[in-house]
Amino acid sequence: MNHNHSHLQIPIESDDSSWRQRCNRRMEELKNTQFSSQDAAASSQPVRLLLHKELVGKVMAHELYNAVEDGNVDNFVGVLNQQCRKRKLSLSDIFYQVTGAGDSLLHVAAYHKKEHIAELIAHHFPELLIRRNVRGDTPLHVAVRSKNSNIVHLILSQYAIKKSNHDEMNDKEITRKANEHGDTPLHETIYSGDVDVIKQVFFADNDVVHYLNKSRRSPLYLAVVNGNVEILNLLLEISFPVDLPQCLGNSPLHAALLERKS
């Protein structure tokens, strides 16, 4: 049908509301389209239940990766349409495919700072917000490393909106998900040193400032060691809990100060 292809070359910088309405409509049409493949019908539910390391076998098409990297949201939906028809797969099967590193399309969009595509994916497939890659990183970990506060805000806000309607997200706080090193997204913000990104994650869940990674270091500890006064003052705005976990056998501040002196 022509209307599926007539907007393919419209840049994502076009009228802000029009792309959202247009692409959401096309995504809903794709969701409701049946593709004639027994394999696709049989694989949809099991794929959702796979662990991130098992998902690596479900490798996404390079055309999809390239479409995300390119950043044109209309072209992205067009490529989704092509892949569904070409491979006889449902849209959900397409979205549960990953890169060799276990990255979902949302990880890829966060990495390349493609805000419109990330919003579209999170809106239609919110369960990808808590999907981990082989390193245990969620899209929020990746977004934080990209140092793009808009992407970080988008992921946090989409999670807040979608959480109550999805059982698999209800008991999982996106801000508290730790990767293979035990680092939460807030740990990653301190490594990145981007104050705007730190504020986004910190104000979404400030209790994480005391969470220890596998090296027994909290975000507060890391901030002291890094010596950025602006970041440290921000993190010290909250009160210290009585049962504060110990960093290397000391309080976060004491442990960090000892390390700075050594």
Residue spans for each PLM region:
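Intrinsically disordered, low-complexity cytosolic terminal tails
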Residues: M1-S92, I161-E168
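Ankyrin repeat domain, specifically the short helix-to-loop turn at the C-terminus of the second helix
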Residues: L80-S92, L120-L128, L154-E173, Q200-V208, ...
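General structural concept
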Residues: S92-S146
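Ankyrin-repeat boundary/linker signal
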Residues: Q97-V98, R131-R132, D167, A178, ...
